[in-house]
Amino acid sequence: MKNAFFVTASIACGKSTFIEIANSLGFKSISADKIAHKILDENALELEKIFSPFNLKNLLTKEKKIDRKILGEIVFNNKEAKKTLENFTHPKIRAKILEQMQILDKENKAFFVEIPLFFESGAYENLGKVIVIYTPKELSLKRIMQRDKLSLEAAKVRLDSQIDIEEKLKKADFIIKNTNSYVDFRQECVKVIQEISKGKM
């Protein structure tokens, strides 16, 4: 799709912040995470049954929604559980993303699709150009620990579950560095967005 620009990175690199900046400049976006969260909640009871072999306690909240923290703990430490979740959710997420992309592409204006596992999934390649947000591994670990209140070991497990950021950079059409202040990062984002929008407005 000529108007689609995918946004990906490692964990805690600033993908969502980029999307917020793009939205503030008048560009529309799609978030794989938001779609995934909705799918988890809509299928909470079914997922509880699917994950019953893993003996998870309190997978559902009192509101009968998925407790994503509990789910994350098992998924990032159990390859079988991770595969089970991906087999259930990924086709649904992809279908919803493609549906929304087709709608936005008709507007003939650049839009952004935030997909954390863009390269890992291999499900969206050749559908648009790719923006990779770069943060050094050490800084990503620090941010994960602060944001998610995790130990260093737990943060490493989550970061190592994805393709190394250096490998992602090799496949990027655009690279945005997020290594300093928010002001610097925003300037980098705006610069790339303006470059993209020149031929899309």
UniProtKB/Swiss-Prot annotation:
Localization per Swiss-Prot or TrEMBL:
Cytoplasm
Which residues does the record give as ATP binding sites? A12, C13, G14, K15, S16, T17
Q: What does the record give as EC number?
A: 2.7.1.24
Residue ranges constituting the DPCK domain according to the UniProt record: 4-201
Classification via Pfam families: CoaE
Q: Which reaction does it catalyse?
A: 3'-dephospho-CoA + ATP = ADP + CoA + H(+)
Entry annotated with the keyword ATP-binding:
yes
> Is Nucleus among the key words of this record?
no
Q: Which SUPFAM superfamilies match?
A: P-loop containing nucleoside triphosphate hydrolases
Q: Which Gene3D superfamilies match?
A: P-loop containing nucleotide triphosphate hydrolases
What the entry lists under PANTHER family is as follows: BIFUNCTIONAL COENZYME A SYNTHASE-RELATED (PTHR10695:SF46), DEPHOSPHO-COA KINASE-RELATED (PTHR10695)
**What is this protein for, i.e. what is its function?**
Catalyzes the phosphorylation of the 3'-hydroxyl group of dephosphocoenzyme A to form coenzyme A.
What name does this protein carry? Dephospho-CoA kinase
Query: Mind giving the lineage of the organism this protein is from?
Result: Bacteria, Pseudomonadati, Campylobacterota, Epsilonproteobacteria, Campylobacterales
